[in-house]
Amino acid sequence: MATEYAIIAGGCFWCTEAVFKQIHGVVSVESGYIGGHTENPTYKQVCGGDTGHAEAIRIGFDPEKVSFGDLLDISFATHDPTQLNRQGNDIGTQYRSAIFPVSEEQLEEAKMAIARAQSEHNDAIVTTIEAHSTWYPAEDYHQDYWAGEGQGNRYCLAVIPPKLQKLHKRFAAYTAPE
């Protein structure tokens, strides 16, 4: 089966990348920027909040092993989709919760996933569905961050392990074998 792609944002891309790298059926995860107005943005520019881009991940997946809807359910369970333009202490539109469908089918599934997530939250889901736009890969040092520098980064050590615990507790069937 051909690889399909999903683009989602849910806070710091180091943290979302770490979650999706562990999913059976995911063949690639790339951190990057999408949804803004600046061509070829840098991390520094995106962090400045003036480009309009979100920190996001582009997930390559085998739809015979994990569906787009499954990926969205995992995303909603491993970040707080009720926080507007932030995740924890990361504040700004670059940390927004968003889905960037690459097809009409993904658009419809995104709407259904938001409805499923809303049934599990008392506060309103603020995740946006945004038009697919140009994807800009983040700089090399951001790729596979948790497996490298992230293990020594205090921020990552505080944020990523709880996300992974949620993943393994709720979605054990989708967790890639070690």
Swiss-Prot record:
Keywords: Oxidoreductase. Its EC number is 1.8.4.11. GO terms for molecular function: L-methionine:thioredoxin-disulfide S-oxidoreductase activity; peptide-methionine (S)-S-oxide reductase activity. It catalyses: L-methionyl-[protein] + [thioredoxin]-disulfide + H2O = L-methionyl-(S)-S-oxide-[protein] + [thioredoxin]-dithiol; [thioredoxin]-disulfide + L-methionine + H2O = L-methionine (S)-S-oxide + [thioredoxin]-dithiol. It is an enzyme of class 1 (oxidoreductase). NCBIfam families: msrA. This is Peptide methionine sulfoxide reductase MsrA. It comes from Erwinia tasmaniensis (strain DSM 17950 / CFBP 7177 / CIP 109463 / NCPPB 4357 / Et1/99). The gene is msrA.
